[in-house]
Amino acid sequence: MKMKHFTRLLSLFFILITSLSLAKSTIVSHDERAITINGKRRILLSGSIHYPRSTADMWPDLINKAKDGGLDAIETYVFWNAHEPKRREYDFSGNLDVVRFIKTIQDAGLYSVLRIGPYVCAEWNYGGFPVWLHNMPNMKFRTVNPSFMNEMQNFTTKIVKMMKEEKLFASQGGPIILAQIENEYGNVISSYGAEGKAYIDWCANMANSLDIGVPWLMCQQPNAPQPMLETCNGFYCDQYEPTNPSTPKMWTENWTGWFKNWGGKHPYRTAEDLAFSVARFFQTGGTFQNYYMYHGGTNFGRVAGGPYITTSYDYHAPLDEFGNLNQPKWGHLKQLHTVLKSMEKSLTYGNISRIDLGNSIKATIYTTKEGSSCFIGNVNATADALVNFKGKDYHVPAWSVSVLPDCDKEAYNTAKVNTQTSIMTEDSSKPERLEWTWRPESAQKMILKGSGDLIAKGLVDQKDVTNDASDYLWYMTRLHLDKKDPLWSRNMTLRVHSNAHVLHAYVNGKYVGNQFVKDGKFDYRFERKVNHLVHGTNHISLLSVSVGLQNYGPFFESGPTGINGPVSLVGYKGEETIEKDLSQHQWDYKIGLNGYNDKLFSIKSVGHQKWANEKLPTGRMLTWYKAKFKAPLGKEPVIVDLNGLGKGEAWINGQSIGRYWPSFNSSDDGCKDECDYRGAYGSDKCAFMCGKPTQRWYHVPRSFLNASGHNTITLFEEMGGNPSMVNFKTVVVGTVCARAHEHNKVELSCHNRPISAVKFASFGNPLGHCGSFAVGTCQGDKDAAKTVAKECVGKLNCTVNVSSDTFGSTLDCGDSPKKLAVELEC
């Protein structure tokens, strides 16, 4: 009896433990309408924040701002080459601590979407693949290749195991509600033929076997193998419909802006157009949407891909590179999220009916037993509309969506922005004058003697030699010439067929010149005249520089990098041209630069005694600079102005803040003074900063700095520049503007700084834009500037009711809609 009683108690104990465990778990599934959480259909709003593109100290603030902006989830890729830089040697430290990042999301009360890939694209170096993978025998990426599949499965399994061990999947009570395998393979699958289909089937089976207890995604993958869920990526996904009728309409990448390339302009996507794309998606049946990016961040070190992706990955996201609110985008979307959430039951359970109102205007009605919710969408790119709907008139601007949660009152219109615009600026304090020391890069052995670390017959691709350990690779060979050589003449050139992103050439220790890629032409011919060849042995030294490895396209891993030849000397004798191909000569190779290998950027560098503090050179190639500075006071984000420098890399206290290239200006054409949000967006539309450096300012995370005492900035200058203008600043809100519509409330804030003055205010039909507002033909009879000043000046934030009650009668305006234009100084 005692034994039987004990067995019964033990059984009850295990049942209790199991019940408690299940109570903590979250059941994530889906039907044809939506992702379901614990059996309930959900509207889910997500945003991409990539943990390596910020610092661990920044994560809580970024995630909380995303939550305050109305998001339910944070999405991130997992970056294979960052975590496994050498085969079976892993790094999950610092800002690579993905487990800590997911737990930080959980601590904020948000869900997580984990896109393991492990191909990520993401404008990340080599698409996230480690280069050692490429250098394995018989390797082909993203196809039926046993070596690749084994390595992909190994890394994917490791990440899943790490998440399971920390109980981070929703099925274990964690925040991860969705995971992704592969990435945008549908864009390239046709290039791989039957093996592409077999590979994607294998991916699905492999992922499914890992038993994570939440759905798997495959983005941009029509007819994704079951049970994978296909999703859409793009600027607009309202016209997208899943090929599988049991899959909900999901959008994994709504591109909030675009990335920047060196030599390119700054992309800009308006808040109106981004909100329009979101509202259209939910109007047409979407229920899951993710912003790519919600915070773009910074490509620290050498992680930027492309080639030619800049260090800044700001992406014109709702949170800027430094973590500040990008207004009005952040606030305008927050208001939309609030309205959409109020309609969640209608959007996920309601019967859908659609009415074509003509002239590209459509209404959509979601009806439940409790009531109805409506959208009125105007996709006409030029004409505003006065729409009569259910017996009422609604003004729906061109290229906008009006949202009516009760099918009666307009709660939101995507083109009617009632959120402030924040103009960020550098603080006005006088910059600290930096005292620089310098030393040359020790390159004489390569330039004069052609001496390297390894020797090969013929030219070898840069990736194969460096394993991506460095941006730099020396190619060096020798050539014997005598007077009788048919090549010899007074008119000779060095000709190089190159795939180097930047090429520097030396002959017999003399600099011949350089060439770098422009306009995306990464296959080019370099040819320069050489006057210093000698009878006897001649040394030719070529420095190949990579600026991020290709990250997208079919078979992108096999794209050439470096100097693939031919390399030749060309002699011109009258009409006769004689060419001597050196490609199959014996070549010496030297990986990296000596200063990198000696870690001159480290604060513990043993070469500190060799730095000079006299006769600071400017315009000198291959030069190291170093200076001490004090961290700017306060908590605002810190930036360093590298104007005056050429190209290179910068470190703060030994930590790389990325590549710099402020001497590379964008073209002078393609920018407009006015940006019209109407009409389909592309990365060139509304671009700005023509004729200016693609990137002048570089992010210095506060966690890289010593708050008290000295800090060290180290620069490696590749092309030649002047460091005397380098200075540190903080980024603050300088001006706040708003152009709010009547019958709304506008919230105004200088982001933790007091509002100091009202520069302009007018209620009626004000003209112009932020920085150039003017009084229109009518305005309220109360002094708008005094009214706003009373409400706002001296405060950190204020709320202004945009109405005639606040600003007085506007009889002169007639029946036309009234607006408040206001500009505040911080």
UniProtKB/Swiss-Prot annotation:
Keyword set includes Metal-binding: no
Transmembrane residue ranges: none
Native source organism of the sequence: Arabidopsis thaliana
Family: Belongs to the glycosyl hydrolase 35 family.
Alphabetical keyword list: Apoplast, Glycoprotein, Glycosidase, Hydrolase, Secreted, Signal
Leader sequence residues: 1-25
GO cellular component: apoplast
Glycan attachment residues as annotated in the record: 154, 254, 351, 380, 491, 665, 706, 797, 801
Pfam families according to UniProt: BetaGal_gal-bd, GHD, Glyco_hydro_35, SUEL_Lectin
Tissue expression: Expressed in flowers.
The EC number(s) this enzyme carries: 3.2.1.23
Compartments, as annotated in UniProt: Secreted, Extracellular space, Apoplast
Enzyme class: hydrolase
Catalyzed reactions per annotation: Hydrolysis of terminal non-reducing beta-D-galactose residues in beta-D-galactosides
Protein's name in the database: Beta-galactosidase 7
Gene Ontology MF term list: beta-galactosidase activity; carbohydrate binding
Residue intervals of the SUEL-type lectin domain: 740-826
Domain of life: Eukaryota
